[in-house]
């Protein structure tokens, strides 16, 4: 519910100071409540805030961030987060992966999971996806009607085709399609491949990724190229970037550029930067723009494929002042971190390993930028970094990478207090 609203609710769970209730009917509506743009919103679990005015969505997320820092991190004295308003609230996602299922009478369902369920909501258009992805999805739907392939997303059953992943180049218009199955189905996919090549979706590659294991990982270790190539190109911070089919790359390119440029601005205003350490460097989207500014950069990435693509991306852009190390950050960082380094941390949602935080507070690099996609783990990690009073938070910047959802990206800049 939004401020000022009145509603009829059903109490589902109650404690002394807490009640969890389900909404039955809104009696008095807030002017901040809007009509969802998506016709599937009431069922689909992909978005959770389409009923809220977009700018107020960001205000809610900012409050959740502040609450996490105060309640989880037990932080009392930190600067007010700066809000960077997103450039677009819809059609921003450059990648999506859809579970697939054949109904008993042969119809193929492609979509997203229903809220709090493993049932697939059949969608034909998603307003947060890049238009090119929606176009490719529409083409795939039509082709699958005439070319039946056994499909079942449920890892407990035999399956066949499990997921369809579509990635688009926002600035290059390239499209890459990956069919994920629990065994090779490339022979079954060839008729589909031929028709997709003849469509207007600008497809540069069609792949079959094989994921035979009964777990929740979408992609497996083996990918077969059916046609074209297994990557796309895009422009990122004026650099040419190669992105693999299973590579991690921020789904909102425009907002990711804003975050990188914010880090560049912080670095440009500091003195005597000897080198930059980019922990969790991925395919080099942070390291390469920073190296192009003339800094010496070391990128650390444990994923083999991402590491190899990062090297290729540096070569494509003729960057000579960068070194990529295919290493575990927790084991490798203690060997190279120096007090005058500028350390950039961009970990997965689970945050930093406690042993890595111990290394940081022991070796004490003078500057730290921590980019986080999870306010809860960010708050936890900051409390551990700050507990010995060796660092001060200089700035907190919030980016809305994921409009229409509760997710938030946060950049925290810390500076060492002691020499």
Curated annotation (Swiss-Prot):
Source taxon at top rank: Bacteria
Keywords of this entry: 4Fe-4S, Iron, Iron-sulfur, Metal-binding, Methyltransferase, S-adenosyl-L-methionine, Transferase
Residue stretches spanning the membrane: none
SUPFAM superfamilies registered for this protein in UniProt: S-adenosyl-L-methionine-dependent methyltransferases
Residues holding [4Fe-4S] cluster: 38, 44, 47, 126
Positions annotated as active site in the UniProt record: 373
CDD domains tied to this protein: AdoMet_MTases
GO molecular function: 4 iron, 4 sulfur cluster binding; metal ion binding; rRNA (uridine-C5-)-methyltransferase activity
Matching Pfam families: tRNA_U5-meth_tr
GO BP terms in the entry: rRNA base methylation
Binding-site residues, S-adenosyl-L-methionine: 250, 280, 301, 346
Family designation: Belongs to the class I-like SAM-binding methyltransferase superfamily. RNA M5U methyltransferase family.
NCBIfam families noted in UniProt: rumA
PANTHER family: RNA M5U METHYLTRANSFERASE, TRNA (URACIL(54)-C(5))-METHYLTRANSFERASE
Name the record gives this protein: Uncharacterized RNA methyltransferase Pro_0965
Species, as recorded: Prochlorococcus marinus (strain SARG / CCMP1375 / SS120)
